[in-house]
């Protein structure tokens, strides 16, 4: 049984300072600190529940790089950051009590396909079933088959090296990734 989260704690000032500086430096994504927004990110497909202090939704790799650059500064060294895709992991990997970096809201584009060489370039928030629907006319698909493939993102699959039905034949996620940026 999942224990209930008690009173909604306020957001700590250091997190608010980070978010303010993030926006001042040109962050184009969204930020969220309301209890409702934080509560939606407090669970995944596991039995765990952790209420984050804030959620950021980058729109581009430049936004992700800005988050990383700012987080690396000494004054923010105590903050914890966790990337999140579809929240389909079963071991709590997408949860923390710091800042969630949600890749699924905006960074969900299929950028390029090269059918001759057999590769596709996508953003981390692309959902596996959507990718396979896109690839089908080219005679390709992205393995492995997951029970959560209608909401699992490629970034999350890479993070957990997802495997599932057909993995013995087609391999796990890392067997199909040429590179990440």
Enumerate the language-model features and the residues they cover.
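FAD-binding subdomain of flavoenzyme oxidoreductases
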Residues: 110-113, 122-181
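Short glycine/serine/threonine/alanine-rich loop segments
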Residues: 76-79, 140
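ATP-grasp fold ATP-binding core
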Residues: 81-83, 144
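N-terminal flexible segment immediately upstream of the FAD-binding catalytic core
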Residues: 1-72, 76, 86-118, 147, ...
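Short, basic and Ser/Thr-rich N-terminal targeting/leader segments
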Residues: 77, 84-86, 152, 176
């Amino acid at each position: 049984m999942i224990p209930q989260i008690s009173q909604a704690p306020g957001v700590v000032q250091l997190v608010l300072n980070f978010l303010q500086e993030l926006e001042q430096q040109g962050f184009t994504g969204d930020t969220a600190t309301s209890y409702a927004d934080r509560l939606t990110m407090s669970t995944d497909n596991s039995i765990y529940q952790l209420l984050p202090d804030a959620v950021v939704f980058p729109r581009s790799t430049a936004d992700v790089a800005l988050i990383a650059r700012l987080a690396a500064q000494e004054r923010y060294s105590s903050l914890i950051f966790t990337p999140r895709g579809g929240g389909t992991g079963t071991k709590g990997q997408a949860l923390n009590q710091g800042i969630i970096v949600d890749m699924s809201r905006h960074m969900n584009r299929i950028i390029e396909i090269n059918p001759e060489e057999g590769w596709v370039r996508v953003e981390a928030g692309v959902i596996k079933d959507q990718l396979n629907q896109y690839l089908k006319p080219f005679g390709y698909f992205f393995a492995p088959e997951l029970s959560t493939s209608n909401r699992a993102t490629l970034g999350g699959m890479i993070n957990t090296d997802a495997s599932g039905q057909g993995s013995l034949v087609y391999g796990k996620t890392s067997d199909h990734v040429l590179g990440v940026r």
